[in-house]
Amino acid sequence: MGLDKFKDKNRDELSMIEVARAILEDNGKRMAFADIVNAVQKYLNKSDEEIRERLPQFYTDMNTDGEFISMGENVWALRSWFPYESVDEEVNHPEDEEEDDSRKHHKKVNAFLASATGDDDIIDYDNDDPEDDDLDAATDDSDDDYSDDDSDYDEDNDDADDVLPDGIEGQLSQLNDEDDDEDD
C-alpha cells in the first residue's frame, strides 16, 4: 500500500508523518531516521531549508505517534510489525548482541588516585597552597610581638591632629529654617 495511496493527492497537502509511515510500509524494514527524512524530502520535493525548519516537529511527531517505535540508535520501525507482547523485548534486547561486544570499552581513569607507574604528576590537594605555610609562620611570630598588657595606651592622650576643622562636616550638621522651606 504505502506511497501508492498518495498517488492522486496533492503532495503539498501531505504531512511528513503520513509520508514517513508510507515509506516504512513500502520499505518493510527498520530505517535510520536520516534515511526516513531523506526519503520524505525526496517524495515531497521539499528544500533542505524547509525540511530543517520542520525537522524538530517531525521528530516529536514520530515519538508521540503510536504507530512508530524507536529501536534505539535512531532507528525506527512501525509498531504494527511487532506483536504486542514482544515490543518490550525487541526494544530492550536487540537481535544483534554481537555489535555491543565490538564497541570499544574505554578504561576509566581516576585522576585523584596514584597511578601504578609512580608518576609524580599527581596533585596533592591537601598540600597545594604554599602561602599556608607562610601564614602559619607569621602567626607564630606575631604572637610574641603583642602582650596581653595594654598599659602603654593612654586614653586621655588625644592628639590635636585628630580634630578636623569645621569644614563641610559642620555645614552638613547645621540646618537652617530656610533649608526646611526649600524641601516642601
Swiss-Prot record:
Q: Record's superkingdom?
A: Bacteria
What are the residue boundaries of the HTH HARE-type domain, all occurrences included?
14-81
Mention one GO biological process in which this protein takes part, according to its record: DNA-templated transcription
Which cysteine pairs make disulfide bonds? Answer: none
Entry keywords, A to Z: DNA-directed RNA polymerase, Nucleotidyltransferase, Transcription, Transferase
Chain intervals for the UniProt region annotation (Disordered): 88-107, 118-184
Q: Identify one Gene Ontology CC term for this UniProt entry.
A: DNA-directed RNA polymerase complex
Which InterPro entries does the record cross-reference, listed alphabetically?
Asxl_HARE-HTH, RNAP_delta_N_dom_sf, RpoE
Query: Keyword DNA repair on this protein?
Result: no
GO molecular function annotation: DNA-directed RNA polymerase activity
Query: Pfam families, alphabetically?
Result: HARE-HTH
Alphabetical list of Gene3D superfamilies matching this protein: RNA polymerase, subunit delta, N-terminal domain (1.10.10.1250)
UniProt feature, compositional bias: Acidic residues: 118-164
Record's keyword annotation contains Transferase: yes
Q: How does it assemble?
A: RNAP is composed of a core of 2 alpha, a beta and a beta' subunits. The core is associated with a delta subunit and one of several sigma factors.
Summary of the function given for this chain in its UniProt record: Participates in both the initiation and recycling phases of transcription. In the presence of the delta subunit, RNAP displays an increased specificity of transcription, a decreased affinity for nucleic acids, and an increased efficiency of RNA synthesis because of enhanced recycling.
UniProt-listed HAMAP family: RNApol_bact_RpoE
Q: What is stated as this protein's family in its record?
A: Belongs to the RpoE family.
Q: What is this protein called?
A: Probable DNA-directed RNA polymerase subunit delta
Q: Which organism is it from?
A: Lactobacillus acidophilus (strain ATCC 700396 / NCK56 / N2 / NCFM)
- Gene field: rpoE
